[in-house]
């Protein structure tokens, strides 16, 4: 296994944290599918299809974080973790913290966009 290393604005979580983000992504996707199924089977009004947005957002955030090896919350808080869960360390360099915040906001915007597009697709499905 390669050595895990904090890289400002690029990598702030290790293998365990990445696995945790994958679990969050899968959980969000499962909840989105359950929500979509419930909305469709209950013969709800079309506007109820927007209910999948939040679980899709959770899935998108988890998935993008796992792919980028970067935790949005840690980036905003100026922290990182490559050890056990809860062994969070502070980023001391202000330039690195700024780079982390920019990456965190980028991940948030990407996640919002992905969840919105997927929700729109579901909304306009002719079923």
Task: Give short role names for the model-derived ranges.
Residues 2-127:
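Membrane-interfacial helix-loop segments of redox and metal-homeostasis proteins
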